[in-house]
């Protein structure tokens, strides 16, 4: 889909660049595949703010997207339509399966209404088809990749994202992610062929603060603009640079500080995403 720009008849339209969604389905989602979503506003069960600068925004309905692709394995599905989903950057596709049953899946690039998709142990290497990643040839572009067998896709799910198979060894597949990281994934984990739809999402410009508010994002205050009681960077006479290395409001280093602590899965990372930056 293309990008839309506007004549600058108002200040916000001058900078506005959005994705043209005129080809998407304009009706409501399938009721059986949706459920209500309660906005937390960044609060936890105690009502305390755990994520700052969240709240408000348009009310949303949660679409139940099939990330596992195992329930209708072996059944050929037909893409009924491509829909907008407010809960993610990618588009979703409504698939109807022979013998009955419908599901939403992440819409891959170049998949349109009327196309046929299928999942199973051995299926064609065609965008939208899902199968164990160990059965795909080296060089295949994939998305919605499982990290645990049967748990559902976890890698490469956002708009325009994909991973590439670069090797196979001893039941594991080596994937190259968009970040530059190379990672081992078990060969029985499912993945979907192709790249995720809406690659132009990276080029949008919201044009005004209010459009960010519609998405549920509140103003992000800088620490150097606060008082000393509110932030380690706060205070000082006149404008200051903060006077120290960047830290969070609680004093922990930020802006580049490594926070990964999951040593249990370090063995699956063949090449770190930080290596290419050196």
Swiss-Prot record:
Report quaternary structure and partners.
Part of the 50S ribosomal subunit. Forms a bridge to the 30S subunit in the 70S ribosome.
* Family of the protein in this entry: Belongs to the universal ribosomal protein uL2 family.
Name of protein: Large ribosomal subunit protein uL2
Looking up PROSITE patterns in the UniProt record yields: RIBOSOMAL_L2
What is the top-level taxon of the source organism?
A: Bacteria
- Alphabetized UniProt keyword annotations: Ribonucleoprotein, Ribosomal protein, RNA-binding, rRNA-binding
Protein role: One of the primary rRNA binding proteins. Required for association of the 30S and 50S subunits to form the 70S ribosome, for tRNA binding and peptide bond formation. It has been suggested to have peptidyltransferase activity; this is somewhat controversial. Makes several contacts with the 16S rRNA in the 70S ribosome.
A Pfam family that this protein carries is Ribosomal_L2
- Gene Ontology terms, MF aspect: rRNA binding; structural constituent of ribosome; transferase activity
Name a single GO cellular component: large ribosomal subunit
A Gene Ontology annotation in the biological process aspect, one of them, is: cytoplasmic translation
């Amino acid at each position: 889909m293309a990008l839309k720009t506007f004549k600058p008849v108002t200040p916000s339209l001058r900078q506005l660049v959005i994705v043209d969604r005129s080809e998407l389905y304009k009706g409501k989602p399938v009721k059986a595949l949706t459920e209500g979503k309660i906005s937390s506003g960044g609060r936890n069960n105690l009502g305390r703010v755990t994520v700052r600068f969240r709240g408000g925004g348009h009310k949303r309905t949660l679409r139940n997207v099939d990330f596992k692709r195992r329930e209708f394995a072996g059944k050929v599905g037909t893409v009924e339509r491509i829909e907008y989903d407010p809960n993610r950057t990618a588009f979703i596709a409504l698939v109807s399966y022979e013998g009955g049953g419908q599901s939403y899946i992440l819409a891959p690039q170049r998949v349109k209404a009327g196309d046929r998709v299928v999942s199973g142990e051995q299926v064609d290497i065609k965008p939208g088809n899902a199968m164990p990643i160990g059965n795909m040839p080296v060089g295949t572009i994939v998305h919605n990749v499982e990290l645990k067998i049967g748990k559902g896709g976890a890698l490469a799910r956002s708009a325009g994202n994909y991973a590439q198979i670069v090797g196979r060894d001893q039941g594991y597949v080596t994937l190259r992610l968009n970040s530059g990281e190379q990672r081992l994934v078990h060969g029985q984990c499912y993945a979907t062929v192709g790249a995720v739809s809406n690659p132009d999402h990276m080029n949008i410009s919201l044009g005004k603060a209010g459009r960010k508010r519609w998405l549920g994002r509140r103003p992000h205050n800088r620490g150097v603009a606060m008082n000393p009681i509110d932030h380690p960077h706060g205070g000082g006479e006149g404008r200051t640079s903060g006077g120290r290395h960047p830290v969070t409001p609680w004093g922990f280093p930020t802006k580049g500080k490594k926070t990964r602590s999951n040593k249990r899965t370090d063995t699956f990372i063949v090449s770190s995403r930080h290596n290419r930056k050196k």
